[in-house]
Every structure is written in structure tokens, then in C-alpha cells.
Curated annotation (Swiss-Prot):
Disulfide bonds join 32-44, 33-42, 38-45. Belongs to the conotoxin M superfamily. Expressed by the venom duct. One of its GO terms (molecular function) is toxin activity. Keywords: Disulfide bond, Secreted, Toxin. Residues 1-31 form a propeptide. This is Conotoxin reg3.12. It is found in: Secreted. The cysteine framework is III (CC-C-C-CC). The keyword rRNA-binding does not apply. Coiled coil: none annotated. GO terms for cellular component: extracellular region.
Length: 45
């Protein structure tokens, strides 16, 4: 079973802009956003 590797391989072929947006979105979910940058993607706002 290698689902993680399969998904990682799929992401390598994404458009760099889309991949960057996915990383930014994941970071927003992990931690609080700064007050001036807060939007619906932040969990602690």
C-alpha cells in the first residue's frame, strides 16, 4: 500500500501556481493567520 507516494507523484505534475496555492492553503489550516491577513482559510479567526 503506497497511497502517500501515489498522491505525492500526482502533485509533482501540477501547475506550479496551483501547487503553491495548495501549500499556502495547507499552511493556513495548520496555524493562525496574522490579523491583517485573516480570511476564511484561517482556522483561528
Amino acid at each position: 500500500d503506497q497511497p502517500v507516494e501515489r498522491h505525492a507523484g500526482n502533485k509533482r505534475h501540477l501547475n506550479p501556481t496551483i501547487r503553491r496555492a495548495m501549500i499556502i492553503d495547507a499552511n493556513r489550516r495548520e496555524k493562525c493567520c496574522e490579523v491583517g491577513w485573516c480570511d476564511s482559510g484561517c482556522e483561528c479567526c
